[in-house]
Design a protein with these regions (language model features):
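N-terminal and secondary-structure boundary signal
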Residues: 1-189
Length: 189
């Protein structure tokens, strides 16, 4: 898994965290309160039940996606759901917002150090990846995944409202689309 390859798993364990992987036996259907496009779905209960997890940290990477346009914090919760995820890709934007009504992430750390600009989500060639100072080399951290994705959209030259799932999640009250209202500050290290 990418956590092992990236060094995230070792660093998290060193800091005392329990690193959990998706256990297919723990999927169960849960209602989606206020769901617009889906009313229930199979979720991995280890990640969504409050008595199972103290803090849920989402560590997505910023990349192009052929169906949703981008995949970052909000889209990354697809890794915590079961059933036929292909069904989620039809009319995807409200479904991404609906899944985030159940999966409530405490902290998002968006890895935009290298950004996949084309041919996502899997990538095509090395030329599809940008790691320039102007277009990438960012780590975005927030308790608000909508704000994270809103800032992330700007790295692709897009406005947050250009991405359907960001607007859907904001309209559902899941976070702030204007990331500047969340006390955004850029640090150079």
């Amino acid at each position: 898994p990418s956590y092992n390859i990236s060094g995230i798993e070792a660093a998290a364990r060193c800091a005392g965290a329990e690193v959990a992987y998706v256990d297919r036996s723990r999927f169960r259907e849960l209602p989606i309160p206020g769901g617009k496009a889906i009313k229930s779905w199979a979720f991995n209960d280890a990640f969504v039940l409050e008595d199972e997890v103290d803090v849920l940290i989402n560590v997505p990477i910023a990349k192009h996606h052929s169906t949703s346009r981008l995949t970052m914090a909000l889209k990354n919760v697809f890794g915590m759901v079961g059933w036929d995820r292909g069904r989620l890709h039809r009319d995807i934007h409200p479904k991404i917002a609906d899944l985030n009504r159940v999966v409530r992430v405490d902290l998002t750390v968006l890895d935009a150090y290298r950004v996949l600009r084309r041919h996502g989500p899997t990538g095509g060639m090395l030329d599809d990846v940008d790691n320039s100072v102007d277009g990438a080399r960012r780590i975005v951290i927030s308790t608000d995944p909508v704000a994270v994705d809103s800032y992330g959209a700007t790295l692709f030259g897009l406005e947050p409202g250009d991405i359907g799932f960001i607007k859907e999640a904001h309209d559902a009250g899941l976070g702030e689309m204007d990331y500047r209202l969340k006390g955004f500050e850029e640090l150079t290290v």
